[in-house]
From Swiss-Prot:
Belongs to the YbaB/EbfC family. Binds to DNA and alters its conformation. May be involved in regulation of gene expression, nucleoid organization and DNA protection. Homodimer. It is found in: Cytoplasm, Nucleoid. GO terms for cellular component: bacterial nucleoid; cytosol. GO terms for molecular function: DNA binding. This is Nucleoid-associated protein Syncc9605_0027. It comes from Synechococcus sp. (strain CC9605). Keywords: Cytoplasm, DNA-binding. Its main location: cytoplasm. HAMAP family: DNA_YbaB_EbfC. The lineage of its organism: Bacteria, Bacillati, Cyanobacteriota, Cyanophyceae, Synechococcales.
Amino acid sequence: MAGFGLPNFGQLTEAFKKAQEIQQNAQALQDELDGMEIEGKSSDGRASVWLSGNQQPLRVRLDPALLQEGQQASETATLEALQAAYEQSTATMKGRMEELTGGLNLNLPGMGG
């Protein structure tokens, strides 16, 4: 069947092995991200939000003095901290995914690899 532009059996077997390896590594990465605690802080440092590496909210801490300033100040600081935690969590997740799939070269003729 090589005349139809299909990869040979050896290449296909290797591709399946790599796919299985990626799947196993992806599960390990998922577990690793679940176990992470990524902190984001407001610009003044008086509000902190922690997310997992999978962006699940874990906890919030607000400085008592911030609460004395009222609802608007507390909401603004909390939002800043949440945005910072989200950006860090997203960057961490993206970086770890690139490490997982980086260097992936299936090299399959006729399959765009």
